[in-house]
């Protein structure tokens, strides 16, 4: 029986997937026979050449699935999870690169603790530069407090499972528990699924979430420019998820406005010292108008 099933969803991901798979092989501290690697392709232009190279790279036991539709990141992952045979799932983005011996400690934790739900690791931008995105506070709270606590806990590497969700770019989760709460919500095409997954798992199974800062992975996000369309998607996804939970839109929008106010205040302060990221500052100002417009309509 396999100990872990790795699910990677691809969409025209040739520039990323081969190095991703190489990093799995390089940092696997358990026998390859214990690993089930599942690639779900979401209707790329030409998946067959990629599949052929992946078979050569990993071996004939790799599971390659051509999705019948591009239903989004969550839907693609659900296809892979339903096909998986191991009790523990590792969700990975194709632009993730493993760094450290990666599997033995988390899998031992799942095998020894039946209440363990999810296991997250430390996200890096490069081998030496930590990311600020290993975990985040839920947006179902005061926005000023969320921004301040996120900054503090990120700096100190403190993870508080009741209020914080682990990055969705790379995490282990117990398959049976994830299935019990319905897996990824397929109404969301991409982005912003982590808070909802954390909420549903916590409501059903409690606080069995663990963060291990000694195990690291690189997420190739460094250098990406601020994008107001991305921020709008995150807001719309939160509005959708919070509506499911009975939280009024005005509360979610107020939280976002509070977060934006705090970040803009920091931006103005940085301008005084000549250290302002002008692109990010401009995006924050534009996003503020988006939030205010939605507030007027709510």
Which functions belong to the PLM regions below?
Residues 101-134:
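Conserved donor NDP-sugar-binding/catalytic core segment of glycosyltransferases
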Residues 66-84:
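Glycine-rich, basic loop-to-helix element that forms the pyrophosphate-binding segment
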Residues 21-66:
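Acidic donor-binding segment of Leloir-type glycosyltransferases
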Residues 4-16, 20, 27-28, 40:
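A conserved hydrophobic helix/loop-capping motif in glycosyltransferases and polysaccharide synthases
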Residues 229-238, 242, 246-298:
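Non-catalytic, C-terminal membrane-associated alpha-helical segments of glycosyltransferases
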Residues 158, 164-183, 187-215:
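A short, conserved alpha-helix in the catalytic core of glycosyltransferases
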Residues 139-163:
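Short, flexible, basic/aromatic active-site loop/helix in glycosyltransferases
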Residues 89:
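Short aromatic/hydrophobic "clamp" motif used to bind/position activated sugar donors
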